């Protein structure tokens, strides 16, 4: 219900980007995706918004952004305040992404779109090129607007 409340007409996923290094799955970033305006999709390219997501707390960690980089403090359809919004099953979502990454280690960098169901998290798809845009769009007041993903890869000794 909490994930659906964000935008009831779409399946609102958590994108968890993983990288497998030396047989160990690592989380590079996570983002929450939600549809808008009655649409059934959560994709930015079809009118959805995306927000940085903290897998440790299960909370949306920043503003929403659409494909034109318009920023939203509140969901444009439901009016729900985005930053700090608690999504369910974040620990299970993270565990599922790491497990999936180990099942396909030949694909080193994958973005797993995971939805929350009544029976637990479920993978909708794995993207073998999840891109970098979802995690690098700066928020207003972001103390590190040029932070990007390079430090996240370097943290694990991954050359980019």
Ranges and model annotations:
Residues 1-64:
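Phosphate-binding site of ATP-dependent enzymes
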Residues 1, 98-101:
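Short, basic/aromatic recognition patches
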Residues 12-14, 107-110:
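Short beta-strand or tight-loop elements
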Residues 28-30, 112, 126:
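Generic beta-strand hydrophobic packing signal
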Residues 60-66, 157-160:
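A general structural signal for short secondary-structure boundary/capping elements
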Residues 53-55, 65-76:
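Solvent-exposed helix/loop surface patches that form functional interfaces
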Residues 71-95, 102-109, 116-160:
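C-terminal active-site "lid" helix and adjoining low-complexity regulatory extension at the edge
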């Amino acid at each position: 219900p909490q994930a659906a409340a964000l935008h009831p007409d779409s399946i609102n996923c958590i994108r968890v980007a993983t990288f497998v290094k030396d047989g160990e799955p690592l989380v590079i970033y996570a983002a929450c995706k939600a549809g808008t305006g009655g649409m059934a999709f959560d994709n930015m390219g079809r009118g959805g918004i995306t927000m940085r997501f903290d897998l440790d707390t299960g909370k949306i960690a920043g503003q929403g952004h659409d494909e034109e980089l318009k920023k939203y403090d509140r969901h444009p359809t439901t009016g729900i305040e985005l930053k700090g919004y608690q999504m369910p099953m974040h620990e299970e979502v993270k565990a599922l992404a790491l497990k999936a990454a180990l099942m396909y280690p030949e694909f080193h960098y994958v973005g797993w779109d995971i939805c929350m169901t009544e029976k637990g998290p479920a993978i909708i798809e794995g993207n073998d090129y999840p891109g970098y845009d979802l995690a690098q769009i700066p928020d207003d007041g972001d103390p590190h607007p040029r932070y990007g993903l390079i430090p996240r890869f370097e943290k694990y000794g991954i050359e980019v």
